[in-house]
């Protein structure tokens, strides 16, 4: 639905909602400063047509690193800059550990699952998920072995093209999805499996829809716009279809479950469900299982595959960087064995390049919303319990106080004077604090092993001259996606 139509709908209903709102109790607390809101519409008129991120960055310049924006009728506190975000999410981690609502997802997730829950439910599910993923990551077939095998499958597929140009999106989706599938479902899929391809298409389409302007406007006025057509309905339809597949998979697992030999995340969860079946207050029930699997599958597929897509577009844009990475690969690994995770500490330049790709591309610029779990005093302001808080991760990843050239791609941001990898507190593509991304470790391992294996086996070429390659993302909302492109993988 067009922005102008959405705005008209909001305006025509705003007055009635305003009248109703006057009879509601007023919010207590002392919020950070921000633009003066209109009744019901909030700060809609201060929103940039380019999206929420652009709007928030402009408001940061005027109001500082902590400010309040009314997204429709509700106040949301914005946290900008490295120091501010760390002070809230790390130093006051418990107070800021609640999960805010993502309006386009809420009809499906409804506060369930390991990513979208809060309080004791979240703590219980996160402890279980971390332990389970760690156990399967360090067992007989470790995550590293799975990634290496998948990387080899990819190399064989790319060799079939014999240097012909291709769009790498499909293959990057397949390899990343297969890793999370092996952990959650206990199996990997052939790249031609119709069910697998359909699931990948649903995830890709949903991710793109969530980045649209329509979805961003929906976050402001979901209470009204949920009754009208829009991207939110397709998102719910897609997610429900994925949930149906997960539910079917859970039933197959239940029918073939061997308590002495759990195969994957689902088996382990089912065993825990059985153990706690007499506990009427347990969080280990079907709803939390399917939403947790949906969350892990969705979050563990699209963000990492999109990072890989951007990685090789950047390598085409800056071929001298790709050449330096390949030189380091040749020196440390050579051509006769697979890259391993142990190689990472011996390859500071490659590691710095991957860090810089994540920083520069900034794929989740706003991050998932938080919510304060109690009345919270922060920098002299009293933020009332249950107020939503947005950590603007982009403002840290592009923080000029921490990065010399924040808007340029420069691996030197992560190298010291001796060429060794250096840490940077502003590097938080996975967020930070207690709600840091559950799959951070797996994602980092995937990026290193896939990136190095591809560059070990192939040189890169583009049908377009480097100076004409566009790195500007298609969307700059809650998520970013790179432009579509063609690439030649030339066997080395």
Swiss-Prot record:
Q: In which tissues is it expressed?
A: Expressed only in differentiated keratinocytes in skin.
A GO cellular component annotated for this chain's UniProt record is: endoplasmic reticulum membrane
The text of the family note is: Belongs to the cytochrome P450 family.
Known InterPro entries for this protein? Answer: Cyt_P450 (IPR001128), Cyt_P450_CS (IPR017972), Cyt_P450_E_grp-I (IPR002401), Cyt_P450_E_grp-I_CYP2B-like (IPR008068), Cyt_P450_sf (IPR036396), Cytochrome_P450_fam2 (IPR050182)
Per the UniProt record, the source organism is Mus musculus (Mouse)
| Residues engaged in binding heme | 437
Where, per UniProt, does this protein localize?
Endoplasmic reticulum membrane; Microsome membrane
Q: What is the designated name of this protein?
A: Cytochrome P450 2B19
